[in-house]
Design a protein with these regions (language model features):
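Flexible, low-complexity junctional segments that flank or bridge functional domains
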Residues: 1-190
Length: 190
């Protein structure tokens, strides 16, 4: 356990503390968490992190999409039924920003030791307006556009609406993860 005194904050190298708490006008516990996360990210230790307070001050909006990590990237594993033909497509960008850039940017918010950790972090948060708005400051509140490379090698754009977290949870619970349907379930041993 380490304490961080005011003197400790002053002694942290500027490259590791881009915006000190002294310079920021922090008004909520959630904002403080984001600032501390930015401070911890350069440590590149995925086991050093801070969780949000139990009661969050803001409600979250999410896009109806879910991803899975595969071969150094992300593929779509859940989408609304009308876009089901795009399941298995590789994510190549969000709002025109290439995934490689997003991997680097998310590593400034969530500590990770390696490239796989960066990909996994984007996998977990690529549907979250709260996180994506930190990576894409121009992100709108009503919808988001994903750039995908389909299994038959076509690049397409798909625009999805954001929805309240409770509605997203309901949607997510009703969507079967069809990306696993091709995995054999009988006569299989590990």
């Amino acid at each position: 356990s380490h304490s961080l005194s005011e003197e400790g904050i002053s002694s942290v190298p500027q490259k590791m503390w881009p915006q000190t708490l002294k310079e920021k006008n922090t008004t909520t516990a959630e904002e403080l968490c984001w600032q501390i996360r930015s401070f911890l990210a350069p440590l590149q230790d995925g086991h050093t992190y801070i969780n949000y307070p139990t009661q969050q001050t803001t409600s979250h909006i999410l896009a109806p999409i879910a991803f899975r990590t595969i071969s150094g990237g992300l593929i779509v594993r859940k989408l609304p039924v009308k876009h089901e033909s795009l399941l298995g497509s590789r994510l190549i960008g969000i709002e025109g920003i290439p995934v490689d850039t997003l991997y680097e940017e998310i590593s400034k918010l969530y500590p990770t030791e390696n490239e796989t950790g960066k990909i996994l972090n984007l996998c977990w948060y690529a549907h979250s307006h709260t996180v994506l708005s930190k990576l894409i400051p121009t992100l709108k509140n009503d919808s988001i556009t994903y750039q995908l490379n389909t299994p038959d090698n076509h690049n397409i754009r798909i625009k999805l609406p954001f929805m309240p977290e409770e509605e997203w949870k309901e949607w997510n619970d009703t969507q079967k993860d069809k990306s696993r349907s091709k995995i054999p379930t009988t006569n299989l041993s590990f």
